[in-house]
Amino acid sequence: MTGGGNITEITYFILLGFSDFPRIIKVLFTIFLVIYITSLAWNLSLIVLIRMDSHLHTPMYFFLSNLSFIDVCYISSTVPKMLSNLLQEQQTITFVGCIIQYFIFSTMGLSESCLMTAMAYDRYAAICNPLLYSSIMSPTLCVWMVLGAYMTGLTASLFQIGALLQLHFCGSNVIRHFFCDMPQLLILSCTDTFFVQVMTAILTMFFGIASALVIMISYGYIGISIMKITSAKGRSKAFNTCASHLTAVSLFYTSGIFVYLSSSSGGSSSFDRFASVFYTVVIPMLNPLIYSLRNKEIKDALKRLQKRKCC
């Protein structure tokens, strides 16, 4: 800590993490390390596969490759530091490191929310307007939608960081979490946080409620279109096209809403921390599995890649 007049500013935070479970620290380290490596391997493999196979150069897989990239950055913003702290007695992070960690985490999380909205629109165009799909989802539009997702997430995060840097931290420096998250930082502030709380609420409404509403409306129209398909095979194919994205969206939003509703208490309970693990660590690992498990095009691309290697 550094002194400045009558105020002692915090220069580092202590991340409580899972230090209240000393008996299972090594087990947790092993589990999180396996999840992290698996997540990186699956997401990066999916990016490479989509890049290498020309049959996957479509809007759907363009969005999916960007989702995998976001998930790699998203999980990497928290897990490496968490793994490092699990092996240390003093689990600390500098003030600057904390701000950078939250900035990356927030940017990627908000960008993912926007990207999932774009992916829902892509599925809407594919199911509801199949004849016009190619003209609607042009390469130019797809690029702008992805850039828009990144820029929106980045801009919103910059606003949050700007507001966060206006606060003073001069009391307790113990964060009862395994990473720097906004609710926990606001609790530690010794200055008024009303403006930051209002801004966070507005951003939550925009990225959470508004995005979820757009996705729900898109899938409402998709559901109506699927019901109009006469053949059972056609309905099944249309449903399978959307099922993976709907599953990923449901997991992302329900877990996120649950974690941030429970964080009103500061995320101090052990249950809150373990619930956050699912939202921040497990979902980035599950996404490539969800999109690939029953995806015939991904399986066919893997077969073509194997044949290419054999030749």
From Swiss-Prot:
Its main location: membrane. It comes from the Eukaryota. The chain crosses the membrane at residues 27-47, 56-76, 101-121, 135-155, 198-218, 239-259, 273-293. Residues 1-26, 77-100, 156-197, 260-272 are extracellular. It is found in: Cell membrane. Glycans are attached at residue 6. The keyword Flavoprotein does not apply. Disulfide bonds join 98-190. Residues 48-55, 122-134, 219-238, 294-311 are cytoplasmic. The keyword Transcription regulation does not apply. It is a multi-pass membrane protein. GO terms for molecular function: odorant binding; olfactory receptor activity; trace-amine receptor activity. One of its GO terms (biological process) is adenylate cyclase-activating G protein-coupled receptor signaling pathway. Keywords: Cell membrane, Disulfide bond, G-protein coupled receptor, Glycoprotein, Membrane, Olfaction, Receptor, Sensory transduction, Transducer, Transmembrane, Transmembrane helix. GO terms for cellular component: membrane; plasma membrane. Odorant receptor for musk, which specifically recognizes muscone, musk xylol, and musk ketone. Ligand-binding causes a conformation change that triggers signaling via G(s)-class of G alpha protein GNAL, activating adenylyl cyclase. Belongs to the G-protein coupled receptor 1 family. PANTHER family: OLFACTORY RECEPTOR. This is Olfactory receptor 5AN1. It comes from Homo sapiens. The gene is OR5AN1.
